[in-house]
Amino acid sequence: MEVPLQKSAPGSALSPARVLGGIQRPRHLSVFEFESDGFLGSPEPTASSSPVTTLTQTMHNLAGLGSEPPKAQVGSLSFQNRLADLSLSRRTSECSLSSESSESSDAGLCMDSPSPVDPQMAERTFEQAIQAASRVIQNEQFTIKRFRSLPVRLLEHSPVLQSITNSRALDSWRKTEAGYRAAANSPGEDKENDGYIFKMPQELPHSSSAQALAEWVSRRQAFTQRPSSAPDLMCLTTEWKMEVEELSPVAQSSSLTPVERASEEDDGFVDILESDLKDDEKVPAGMENLISAPLVKKLDKEEEQDLIMFSKCQRLFRSPSMPCSVIRPILKRLERPQDRDVPVQSKRRKSVTPLEEQQLEEPKARVFRSKSLCHEIENILDSDHRGLIGDYSKAFLLQTVDGKHQDLKYISPETMVALLTGKFSNIVEKFVIVDCRYPYEYEGGHIKNAVNLPLERDAETFLLQRPIMPCSLDKRIILIFHCEFSSERGPRMCRFIRERDRAANDYPSLYYPEMYILKGGYKEFFPQHPNFCEPQDYRPMNHEAFRDELRNFRLKTRSWAGERSRRELCSRLQDQ
């Protein structure tokens, strides 16, 4: 059984025109056509049923809000019938729930029912709220994407477009638009159409394809006459500048009225594309010139004489719209003198300072490097000194060979023979052959003019206490050490003399800067050159007849070595 709907008060909670937080409900839904029977959200009277039953019936009636709006009275009747079916089905499903909660509802423990609402008053209030919301939306300005770079209202304020003669069209268009808005907001208009915002755009009349193609070809030909590079812009005359300004997209966009803009944005562009596909083989003459013509325009001789040359940097970074007269030329004189044979006489300016002051000015003193050997020593140390003698002043005179010790220089027996025969007499003032063997070995056979110095103290006394000095700086003093094999005693004696020589002189000066070792010793020299030995014999160190002498000289050598080490230790302690 249907319960009759009662009218709801306009200020009730379920009234559509109720304002939440002071904001009116915007018009986002189409207006429903309500019947006089009642409003969809109006509740049932509380006297005939319990509050829970009333709330259930109210929810059944509200279920129709999600359905499609009716378009005629017949649709509204079917809509009410559908609501009745829904309410019956839901009542049967929830009868058990209402019976169980009857006791609590009678006790007054449920929600209060909303007050009744008048359907006609609710419909009128809802329409007024939607109309007010539509006026707010119409007054707001939305940012719409434009195809032009300048907005419509700012076109007449642009300094570039101040000389446009069609600004009146803009004013008339603005007035027309204002008239449309005033007519739309007038109170005498129908309320149903007053809230309407969006309208279907009307199609613009398309121009014929032949007319659009002709206009497109004329624009292409005009574009081909424009300068194609920065050098062409520099050579423009006054007439060319006017033509370029007319062809500028800014000027073209400013010279169009809003009505022309709308027609130009959609003035048969699709038709032009279709005609391009049909006439693809027919290329306009302007396009052929654009493809085949050179980028740089060739000037005549008369135009070249009138042209002012500018620096490359200024031409590269200059704006194309910048006039040529602003940039200064490189040369103040545009034409150089033709007669270069005759010197150009320039006037010499008189000096401001008097001659007396010029004469009193003293010349600036030049700074010279102080005389020092440090620079030379650094150069010597930085260079490869392995090919130089001990004081790094000269290279080795004799030809050297590889030996057992890499820090010493070795010579062959043939080089020794050349030295004995006097082949280096013009350079070598004196050479000393130091025989480091024991005395019984020396007496058994030795090289001619050799000196026997078996002990280190004997060598130090003979060579360093009274050093041999050359008579001239061009001459050299050479020392040659050897023993039986030139493997132990000869190299040790050579190092000892160099060590004492370094201690006795300031670095890098030496008494004997050039010293050699005879490779192979006396054992290798005697079989090859016995004529340069006296006596012509060879006595080895381990000879059975001289074992006692060998033992004595070894003890002396060890004691001398021990005394030397003790003396060195004492000297180091004294220095500390």
From Swiss-Prot:
Residue ranges annotated for the Rhodanese domain, each copy included: 427-534
EC number from the UniProt entry: 3.1.3.48
Name of the gene this protein is made from: Cdc25b
Protein name per Swiss-Prot or TrEMBL: M-phase inducer phosphatase 2
Top-level taxon of the source organism: Eukaryota
Gene source species: Mus musculus (Mouse)
Positions bearing Phosphoserine: 42, 167, 248, 321, 351, 372, 559
GO biological process: cell division; female meiosis I; oocyte maturation; positive regulation of cytokinesis; positive regulation of G2/M transition of mitotic cell cycle
UniProt-annotated location(s): Cytoplasm, Cytoskeleton, Microtubule organizing center, Centrosome; Cytoplasm, Cytoskeleton, Spindle pole
Coiled-coil segments on the chain, per record: none
Region described as Disordered: 90-119, 338-358
Subunit structure: Interacts with MAPK14 and 14-3-3 proteins.
InterPro entries (UniProt xref): MPI_Phosphatase, Rhodanese-like_dom, Rhodanese-like_dom_sf
Regulation affecting activity: Stimulated by B-type cyclins.
Posttranslational modification: Phosphorylated by BRSK1 in vitro. Phosphorylated by CHEK1, which inhibits the activity of this protein. Phosphorylation at Ser-351 by AURKA might locally participate in the control of the onset of mitosis. Phosphorylation by MELK at Ser-167 promotes localization to the centrosome and the spindle poles during mitosis. Phosphorylation at Ser-321 and Ser-372 by MAPK14 is required for binding to 14-3-3 proteins.
Keywords assigned by UniProt, alphabetized: Cell cycle, Cell division, Cytoplasm, Cytoskeleton, Hydrolase, Mitosis, Phosphoprotein, Protein phosphatase
Tissue specificity field: Expressed predominantly in spleen, lung, heart, brain, intestine, and muscle.
Record carries keyword Glycoprotein: no
Name of the top EC class for this enzyme: hydrolase
Segments of skewed composition (Low complexity): 90-105
Active site positions, chain numbering: 483
One CC-aspect GO term: centrosome
GO molecular function, one term: phosphoprotein phosphatase activity
